[in-house]
Amino acid sequence: MVVFSKVTAVVVGLSTIVSAVPVVQPRKGFTINQVARPVTNKKTVNLPAVYANALTKYGGTVPDSVKAAASSGSAVTTPEQYDSEYLTPVKVGGTTLNLDFDTGSADLWVFSSELSASQSSGHAIYKPSANAQKLNGYTWKIQYGDGSSASGDVYKDTVTVGGVTAQSQAVEAASHISSQFVQDKDNDGLLGLAFSSINTVSPRPQTTFFDTVKSQLDSPLFAVTLKYHAPGTYDFGYIDNSKFQGELTYTDVDSSQGFWMFTADGYGVGNGAPNSNSISGIADTGTTLLLLDDSVVADYYRQVSGAKNSNQYGGYVFPCSTKLPSFTTVIGGYNAVVPGEYINYAPVTDGSSTCYGGIQSNSGLGFSIFGDIFLKSQYVVFDSQGPRLGFAPQA
């Protein structure tokens, strides 16, 4: 089954971006807390499908072994300890929805009242407010690596996150959704935080929530604290010094493709000294895994006892009892360290003694994806001025 909060749309076209209207009020900053998904609603996750969809998100080629494993139906029931999904409450129109914040996409799309009762059952749904405006002739559609899809209409409505409201914000309301999404009861939609240039609304892309409201904020930035085994936070408009150690290290962002792309200066495995082999990659809260070049992945798993690249499971696996080495990314002279336990993602099936790695190949994408496996170890500032990214170890 697909985990739709961890994947995003294929870009369907680019043109002049239509801006929403922020509510005029004093400049401010605020923090919004994630919430844990309901423990009463356990979910099965096909781990190779998570991997396949992450590759498809960026137009990558999914290896045949991963396709085969993803279609085999093998799945693991995902309890809280695997950090599968933490969501953020957002008021869309008059309804509070739990959305996944995704720095790797630029769409705000939601389950809506346009879906049938059977498709929306178990979800909070968006109902256009009395002041909402439907954009006639505007549509959106997303497609994922496992063949799942969603599409619908576009409205302008109010969207509130924390203490900030955007009026006339583009809201992509689902009117059609495939069965994979219907089965995922934990998530009501997605709020994209990439650059507005890759918004997928046709015929004209729309601005993201962040681009709409950033003029209201004390500073045009947001900071992400994803946590290991716990809900995290998003700070909008300010940097919370209590959430990180030492000083922030900043690096430039190449936003030409619409993503928060940066270049790391090298990497290291375990206690070994980092090398100077650069890694270009995207900081993406909407991807679970850390996807790296084949050579980097091979370097890592050479130091993992019993690790192998498994055709059966569609990726690197290892004995669950194995103690994993850390992975270090060098950014502007700062060593961003991911502890080894973060990289042990989950057993391949319920009760299995074989575990699936949180580091996998980027399958020749040409760049890496620094997903949640990496981000959970860092306080990360997404600063639109520059633009630039700031990194520091979490407090």
Curated annotation (Swiss-Prot):
Disulphide-bridged cysteine pairs: 320-355
Keyword Signal listed: yes
UniProt superkingdom: Eukaryota
Signal sequence residues: 1-29
InterPro entries recorded: Aspartic_peptidase_A1 (IPR001461), Aspartic_peptidase_AS (IPR001969), Aspergillopepsin-like_cat_dom (IPR034163), PEPTIDASE_A1 (IPR033121), Peptidase_aspartic_dom_sf (IPR021109)
Catalytic machinery residues: 102, 284
Subcellular localization(s) per the UniProt record: Secreted
Catalytic activity, EC: 3.4.23.18
Main location: secreted
pH dependence: Optimum pH is 5.0.
Catalytic activity from the UniProt record: Hydrolysis of proteins with broad specificity. Generally favors hydrophobic residues in P1 and P1', but also accepts Lys in P1, which leads to activation of trypsinogen. Does not clot milk
Residues making up the propeptide: 30-70
Gene Ontology annotations of biological process type: proteolysis
A GO molecular function held by the record: aspartic-type endopeptidase activity
A cellular component term, taken from the record's GO annotations: extracellular region
Domain Peptidase A1 span(s) in chain numbering: 86-392
Swiss-Prot/TrEMBL keywords: Aspartyl protease, Disulfide bond, Hydrolase, Protease, Secreted, Signal, Virulence, Zymogen
Function field: Secreted aspartic endopeptidase that allows assimilation of proteinaceous substrates. The scissile peptide bond is attacked by a nucleophilic water molecule activated by two aspartic residues in the active site. Shows a broad primary substrate specificity. Favors hydrophobic residues at the P1 and P1' positions, but also accepts a lysine residue in the P1 position, leading to the activation of trypsinogen and chymotrypsinogen A. Can catalyze hydrolysis of the major structural proteins of basement membrane, elastin, collagen, and laminin. Thought to play a significant role in virulence.
Family recorded in the similarity comment: Belongs to the peptidase A1 family.
Protein name per its UniProtKB record: Aspergillopepsin-1
Organism: Aspergillus fumigatus (strain ATCC MYA-4609 / CBS 101355 / FGSC A1100 / Af293) (Neosartorya fumigata)
